[in-house]
Amino acid sequence: MALNHTALPQDERLPHYLRDEDPFASKLSWEADLVAGFYLTIIGILSTFGNGYVLYMSSRRKKKLRPAEIMTINLAVCDLGISVVGKPFTIISCFCHRWVFGWFGCRWYGWAGFFFGCGSLITMTAVSLDRYLKICYLSYGVWLKRKHAYICLAVIWAYASFWTTMPLVGLGDYAPEPFGTSCTLDWWLAQASGGGQVFILSILFFCLLLPTAVIVFSYAKIIAKVKSSSKEVAHFDSRIHSSHVLEVKLTKVAMLICAGFLIAWIPYAVVSVWSAFGRPDSIPIQLSVVPTLLAKSAAMYNPIIYQVIDYRFACCQAGGLRGTKKKSLEDFRLHTVTAVRKSSAVLEIHPESSSRFTSAHVMDGESHSNDGDCGKK
């Protein structure tokens, strides 16, 4: 039975265009809800198994994880959290044609989606900044240790926790989305008060614009650096050139991850900003659900990029499941390879020792690639 708006305990906190109706009733047709439910089910299954597989393969070599790999695993944790903690709520609600978990469930769902989404974006920001420093500042990689990666993880989760908990303590709130079967940050508070505008603007800047700017800046600098150094690398022997090619490939994978995330979330951000500072009731309900569904698919992209785009990674995963040699897992590299960078840094001081170091490093990688036919195209 539909709820009467007078029975809602948080009626005064609702967006103005939801106060005269049941905010948890779906505004879509039954057919549209069923399509959305099946779509989210497929996305959730693929994301759960994909990111779970990444974590499983990582756990098999946890003693060998490097700092950048730790950050990539954290990204998989964020994506898995979105799929396991959040998606079931919306899927069930779509099939029930209304949000069935009440205000407590609405707040929980809104918090979880914001928490893991923010954690994912900040993790990608940290990875892009890390790669920028490693490639453009040679001395950075010398002192970077595992403990620094764990400190970075603590900062990421503290940052996400701070911004996502603010609405739960009175600065902002979580509310139903216009179509009724999902909940999100209450963007409409920006139209209610000056304090609401300040809060929404702060969220947009610190949780979207600033991280996106850092990502774009970092990869723009990386592209410029790779282009300027490619001619220099061509003069080295084939082993150093191979390391350079692999480094560029892994950087492209990272860029694809960030691009996929931003492509999925930017339409949703645009609609949210329009809801906060424009005329939210001017957006058709049927249209407002599309950016939401697109954003919810972001957690599925990364495993596909890992296992399809990076063929070497996928090959070594398959070899690991068949019980091949443990060293074949060395090709499970979701981080920027630093062979060229290190060799270039040492070359300026000790050319002979640099050549020996790089050759040994690359030959070691080649020997692992031969096990299980990893790296064959």
UniProtKB/Swiss-Prot annotation:
Tissues where the protein occurs: Expressed in the brain (at protein level). Weakly expressed in the skin and liver (at protein level). Abundantly expressed in striated muscle cells. Expressed in Math7/Atok7-dependent retinal ganglion cells in the ganglion cell layer (at protein level). Additionally expressed in horizontal and amacrine cells in the inner nuclear layer of the retina (at protein level). Expressed around the base of hair follicles and in epidermal and sebaceous gland cells of the outer ear (at protein level).
Molecular function terms, GO-annotated: 11-cis retinal binding; G protein-coupled photoreceptor activity; G protein-coupled receptor activity
SUPFAM superfamilies for the chain: Family A G protein-coupled receptor-like (SSF81321)
Protein location: Cell membrane
Disulfide bonds: C106-C183
Job of this protein: G-protein coupled receptor which selectively activates G(i) type G proteins via ultraviolet A (UVA) light-mediated activation in the retina. Preferentially binds the chromophore 11-cis retinal and is a bistable protein that displays emission peaks at 380 nm (UVA light) and 470 nm (blue light). Required for the light-response in the inner plexiform layer, and contributes to the regulation of the light-response in the nerve fiber layer, via phosphorylated DAT/SLC6A3 dopamine uptake.
Protein name per its UniProtKB record: Opsin-5
Species assigned in the record: Mus musculus
